[in-house]
């Protein structure tokens, strides 16, 4: 059987027409107005950037002043004059067969060549230290990018710079975890979780060892001058060691520059973090009762060495910190206190025997 037809439905009001978007009228600029047209300035300053980060970033990328350009131009002109005068002396000595003067010109050429080679080597190492900041910025962009094609080559370059062999287990796990459908953010993130912790663990061990040596040296040494010289020497060794672990070869000027950047970073951001992390344990009555004055000074020196190593690690590291993987000063503090207590107990028990 067929179903009966439905009754007709009458609407009281007519159907409403769908609103259509009206296009704006065309706006044209005259030639005079186009000359005075200027795009609006967009403030792209990151909100999370603090004073310390801005200061370190400005130190890493210094602006070339007029005086610096004048000094560099004067040095270049002086070098060209020395080379030209040396060539003229050599030609005159050859024409007059003045062999003594010719030998002096040859010795001067060797000295100038050695000096130029040293300057070029120092400049290359200093440029490599500055380039690490650009690599860290590039890694930060890749960690927020959804593009494809740059992440794998970037991570392979970082592994090569750090001296990680292709047969390393961590690098093999990274190769097994990546595939063609992943974007740059995922590939760099896998590298940060699988390969980068290998270098970070070595840097942490170096920081712990150097901090413990500084703590014990200050705690047992009676001479303040020896303490200062020892701490300065060990801190420089620590910076060199961390830079080598992350594939940065330091020269004289690049070493001074890194040391200055580390001290600058500590001066801006270190005091508040040091007070926050050391805080209650440092002011604890129990700790003050158990440790002597020299032991407390040793812990302070060890904490400063650890802080120096953490900041050097942050400046030499090719990737930014993610997922709260930054080393904390509290971890080294507990380790230093434990080692110092163990050493003091051994020193007290040895005379009794």
Curated annotation (Swiss-Prot):
GO terms for cellular component: plasma membrane. Residues 1-35 are annotated as: Disordered. Keywords: Cell inner membrane, Cell membrane, Membrane, Transmembrane, Transmembrane helix. Its main location: membrane. The chain crosses the membrane at residues 70-90, 100-120, 213-233. It is found in: Cell inner membrane. Residues 1-19 have a biased composition (Basic and acidic residues). It comes from the Bacteria. It is a multi-pass membrane protein. The keyword Transmembrane applies. Belongs to the UPF0283 family. HAMAP family: UPF0283 (MF_01085). This is UPF0283 membrane protein YcjF. It comes from Salmonella agona (strain SL483).
